[in-house]
C-alpha cells in the first residue's frame, strides 16, 4: 500500500505533494493500493457538526482531504492506474466521517481509509468506524490508518474492517529492551 505519509507533515500548512505526483510514485513503485493525499486533523468534537462552531483549521484540513480524494479518483481513472485507489477521510467526529464516506462512495470509491485516529480513544475510534460502516454498503472496504490497538481488535469484530496499519510494532522493536522481536 502506497501512502503519502501525512504524519510527516502534520505541522505544515499544506501537504508537500500533489495527487498527480503521488499517483506517478505509486505507479512507478508497483503498489497494489494507493492512498489519496490527505492532511491530518488532530482534533475531534461532535459539536462541530454545526459548521458555525467548527474551527477554520479543522474544516480546512477535512475539506482539503475530501476534495483531494475526489480529485485522486478522477486522476486514477484518467490515468487508468493499475492500483486500487483508497480515498482518505479526515473528520471531527462519527457523523462527519460517515458523511464524507458516503460522498466518497458516491464518487466511485470501493475502498476508503479513516485517518487521524491515532490520538483518539479506542471507544471513539469504534464510534467512528461503526457510524461509517452503518452509512456505506457492506462491500466497501475500510482501512484504519495508525490503528495500534492490537489488544482491542476483538472489540471491532463485526464492523467489517478490511485492513489497518500501525508503526507501533516497528517503534517497539527499537525502543523496547525486552519485547522487540515477533516471530
Task: Outline where the language-model segments fall.
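Non-catalytic, usually N-terminal nucleic-acid engagement modules in DNA/RNA processing proteins
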Residues: 1-77
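Glycine-rich phosphate/ribose-binding loops and adjacent secondary-structure elements
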Residues: 79-183
Amino acid at each position: 500500500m502506497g501512502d503519502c505519509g501525512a504524519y510527516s507533515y502534520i505541522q505544515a500548512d499544506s501537504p508537500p505533494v500533489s495527487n498527480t505526483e503521488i499517483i506517478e510514485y505509486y505507479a512507478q513503485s508497483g503498489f497494489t493500493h494507493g492512498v489519496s493525499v490527505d492532511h491530518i486533523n488532530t482534533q475531534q468534537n461532535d459539536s462541530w457538526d454545526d459548521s458555525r462552531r467548527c474551527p477554520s483549521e479543522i474544516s480546512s484540513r477535512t475539506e482539503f482531504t475530501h476534495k483531494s480524494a475526489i480529485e485522486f479518483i478522477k486522476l486514477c481513472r484518467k490515468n487508468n492506474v493499475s492500483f486500487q485507489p483508497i480515498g482518505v477521510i479526515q473528520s471531527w467526529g462519527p457523523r462527519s466521517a460517515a458523511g464524507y464516506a458516503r460522498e466518497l462512495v458516491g464518487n466511485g470509491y470501493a475502498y476508503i481509509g479513516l485517518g487521524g485516529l491515532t490520538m483518539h480513544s479506542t471507544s471513539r475510534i469504534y464510534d467512528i468506524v461503526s457510524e461509517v460502516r452503518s452509512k456505506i454498503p457492506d462491500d466497501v472496504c475500510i482501512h484504519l490508518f495508525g490503528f495500534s490497538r492490537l489488544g482491542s481488535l476483538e472489540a471491532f469484530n463485526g464492523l467489517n474492517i478490511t485492513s489497518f496499519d500501525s508503526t507501533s510494532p516497528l517503534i517497539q522493536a527499537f525502543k523496547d529492551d525486552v519485547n522487540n522481536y515477533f516471530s
